Structure formats: C-alpha cells, structure tokens
Amino acid sequence: MYNPPNNSNSFSNVDDDALAAHLKISQYEEFRLTDAVRPAMDLKIKPSQGYRHDVYVDDETGAKVPVIMAAASAEILFPLFMELVGRLGPMVDVVLETSHDTTAGSHTDMYRDHIDAPVLASTLWDYEDLLMNDGCTGIAVLNPNTPQEVQFDEHKLLIIYGSPLEPFEFNLEQRGVHCCPDMRFITEAEHIHSSSEQLELRFDQLRTELGLDGSHEPNQEEDHGFDFQV
C-alpha cells in the first residue's frame, strides 16, 4: 500500500491506475532502475547514469572529505559496487543500514568490525537480490585505516568517501559511468521507496549471517522519499 504523507507532493490527486503505471516504468532512455526506488511523478529529476564530485563536511570536527556520488544502470550496478569494495583492502568494517520498522526519514545502522573482504564479498553476492531491490536496505563498507568508504545506499546510489579517489574513478569510467559536474540524483527530489515482507525477511537473514544482531544505532536524516510496501 502507498500512502502519501501530505497533499503537497507530486503524487497528490493521482489515481491508483496512474500510480501503478508510473511504478511499472523501470527504464528511462538507456538507464535501468532497480526495483528499490522510483522517481517523482513530475520527473523533475530524470534518472540517468554518471557521477559528480562533492565534499562531505564533518559536523563535529569541520573536516572536509572528498566524495564521489554515482548512479549506474541496473545491469552494471552491483558488479561495479563489488569492484569498488574490492579496492578497500583485505580487511574491512561493514555498516548495514535499514529503514524497516523506523519512522519516515530515519534509518538504523548496524556495525561489524574486522571482517575478511573475501568472506564479505561472497556473502554480498549471495544477497545481491536484496541489496539491489530493497528500498529499505543499504550497506557501507569501509577501511578505517585509509580511511575510505564505499556506500551502496537505499536509493541504490554509490557514494565513495576518502582520498585518493582516482582508483575508484577508473572503475566508474571503465564501466561507462562518466563524470558529469551538473549531475542530479533521484534523492534530490521526491521519490518512492519500495520493499516487501519477503525482502525484509531476506534483510534479517543477511543481518544474522554478518553477525549484526547487536550494535544498532538510530540515524535521523532528511529524505524526500515515501515508502511503498508490496
């Protein structure tokens, strides 16, 4: 069931047939979406492939961290994510992110330190369906010694933190994801997250397999998205 939170969004006054037709659209030109998210009805931001550079500023320290934000078409997205993770080294930390059973605009982070990268990679491949198609699940893999991080968020965007970024740019360009300084992402406008009870069960299985039954931390963040449960 889809239930818009207010009357001031592009989904207002849209009948069920029009909404259903919009949700079925999985490709815009050459860009294929996963099942996790859909753009606004008004398509103020049309999904497309590319990346841009940005800067993350730590609220506490004021430190500036270089960032790459990227969107990739579904057919190359997960292999690209795994290639980026492979650059982090043989031992990594992992953060599993979920907005299952949370209030709108928030998610819960679950932490696991010191996991062998090959072991993690094998597990992530086993859960490719969940990570690609659940709009309530995201994951971040990081090397705290570098420090660098690769995030595959709930919107299925790739976000890379740290320096140097050139090796990650190489992987992006090699896959046909090119730099676009004016790139805009689906997160910068209204959008719909999609999930299901089956995917929530898969999330619980992944959480258990990664040993993430503890170390939960709520995280409040701004998001223009609405949840859609199927």
What label would you give each PLM region?
Residues 1-157, 161-230:
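Structured alpha/beta or helical-core interaction and ligand-binding surfaces enriched in interleaved
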